[in-house]
């Protein structure tokens, strides 16, 4: 039978566990609950409520029952990265300031909890197989951070219009920045865009730095050479206010 509450930090990181032991089953954890870097395939015996962070990254949940049986409410960060997940079924309904689900096998964000669609939240789903940002309501939210590098996204349409800190669309097959954010409060990462054909839609305001690839710029501006970085930067500043540096790699 589950204990009702545990007022402590649960740290089971890196213990080679295949399951969460019955001996520590609980209803609520009033600290952080950390089971990262194990071989766990099921969240059975996890608490229903976590007041701190819920950290279950680098396990094998996608090969078992996924996020089912996990917490229903996490007031801190929810991190389920590196689990071979193919769906978000069973994810917590209420999540605090940040949801991180990098390095999985997600082709859709169906099931994304409505609680993450509130202003000033952070969402990261780098290294998945997402092909579209449309249909999730992102455009009506002012995210704190929005990261989706190394996916299959072809259009930025459907994503947030305003991001308060950083936005990362690196290594996606987009052809332009149309439909993307108009205002980025910190850094805009847009490197390794091998299909990029135009700077159209680049945010009108980037308060931090812009990170782009030299090869992408030379494709867009074929008359320039690798020695024309200053000209490329000047051209970009003519169409976009960049408060920090333009980093051309």
Features from the language model and the residues they span:
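Concave beta-strand-loop units of leucine-rich repeat
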Residues: 12-16, 29-40, 49-62, 74-85, ...
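N-terminal capping/linker segments that flank leucine-rich repeat
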Residues: 1-24, 224-249
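Canonical leucine-rich repeat
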Residues: 20, 43-46, 63-70, 88, ...
């Amino acid at each position: 039978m589950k204990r009702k509450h545990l007022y402590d930090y649960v740290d089971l990181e890196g213990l080679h566990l295949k399951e969460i032991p019955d001996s520590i089953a609980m209803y609520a954890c009033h600290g952080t609950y950390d089971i990262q870097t194990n071989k766990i395939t099921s969240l059975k015996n996890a608490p229903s409520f976590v007041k701190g962070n819920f950290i279950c990254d680098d396990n094998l949940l996608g090969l078992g029952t996924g996020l089912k049986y996990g917490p229903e409410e996490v007031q801190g960060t929810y991190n389920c990265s590196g689990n071979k997940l193919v769906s978000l079924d069973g994810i917590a309904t209420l999540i605090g300031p940040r949801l991180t689900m990098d390095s999985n096998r997600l082709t859709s964000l169906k099931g994304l909890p409505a609680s993450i669609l509130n202003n000033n939240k952070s969402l990261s789903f780098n290294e998945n197989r997402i092909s579209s940002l449309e249909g999730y309501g992102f455009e009506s939210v002012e995210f704190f951070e929005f990261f989706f590098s190394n996916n299959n996204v072809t259009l930025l349409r459907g994503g947030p219009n305003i991001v308060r800190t950083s936005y990362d669309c690196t290594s996606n097959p987009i052809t332009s920045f149309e439909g993307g954010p108009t205002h980025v409060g910190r850094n805009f990462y847009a490197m390794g865009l091998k299909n990029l054909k135009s700077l159209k839609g680049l945010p009108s305001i980037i308060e931090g730095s812009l990170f782009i690839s030299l090869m992408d710029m030379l494709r867009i501006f074929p008359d320039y050479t690798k020695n024309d970085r200053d000209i490329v930067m000047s051209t970009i500043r003519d169409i976009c206010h960049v408060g920090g540096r333009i980093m051309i790699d």
